[in-house]
């Protein structure tokens, strides 16, 4: 999926970093070959890498001008967050110094290296991700700063040493310095992640065959974390929650893509209007990077016209130059699916028949998502972003396993997390709703919740969660595990106790689609 779309974007004349795709057939060979890459494939990878070197005029592992790559998975059907991504591969103790010299930016070089150690250790060496986050959090506490962006080169240097010590302690090995070993390790890990518990769960929930396998995309890195003329973002060509025909997305200045999706920093809006609607003080991309925004808006329209569907797009801006990293059909709510399908017929992008075929009948019951009864008094304790519509009430749980356990006992739960990760999929499926303290409208929690039709409130920074004591604080309120709360994914409000709901009105778009469906049914019957 991802590799084919990258090639397609290149053909449309859009700026795509050079790279290559290892196909799903290789995944099959990998499993047949006792989970090892066949020699022939390794040779192919090396010659493809030479092509990237030619195009970028950089060399892999070079001590003057090192090539860095990203390694990502690409399944036939997008499985958001199910497979693993590694950025900045090709950095080691020596190439990081070369990168610092080339860019005259020591902070950027060290920040990129610590991110690589973090991702590689987590994905390839199986060191728990939160151990690295804790090291960073403790370091920030001692230094008295709030944000990762407040740390300078010497801070990251110290943390790199701590990270390497952590790997040694956990895995009894030194962090790999050989760039070829790094690359093959990363490719192996992507193939292995196809067999991970979370990927299996997602496939089971979405009827995706186990034998399909995943592809791997290797691509030259472009950097969104070099400074303030750099950024990274995720955007949808229309609103995936409501279906409105307006760009919907988020970006972060001086960041890498993972920061937006993982929800570690709560991002800024892409359009000025969205920023104003949300009452946000931070500059939108349209204001902060007007020239790049204009170019991006053109790309959105071009991609939507080409694929004739709402696209979910990842991009990076390096020194004010736009690069497209991926495009795919975006996950959307049932309500959005109907509105987008009807609108696209009106815009002459698709036919009525195509519009009907695009509606997944299994999701139509979510149109009947209950909404909160306006007449009832509500005790609002916090608010966040309205990430996935609908109202839900249930007992507060802090882990995916607990949500699944209570669901088995026919009890409704609301899963409350700092941010969700792909490991939480089973619990998100079991819970009635999801509440996260961090992350935006394009974070993992938001995208997966919309696809599942689960109400979700994300980025509720007013709540502080304590996993140890199993409680969260919202202002003066303390909510313990097992207490009942209600969330409204349409407004972003979090309420104490059980709030009664009412059945919603069916929209005009729904009746339009049903009318068209009837026309086709009659044609067939006659």
Where are these regions (language model features)?
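Acidic, glycine-rich flexible loop/linker segments
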Residues: 371, 379, 387-403, 407-412, ...
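Nucleotide/phosphate-binding sheet-loop regions of phosphoryl- and nucleotidyl-transfer enzymes
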Residues: 1-379, 404-407, 411-414, 421-426, ...
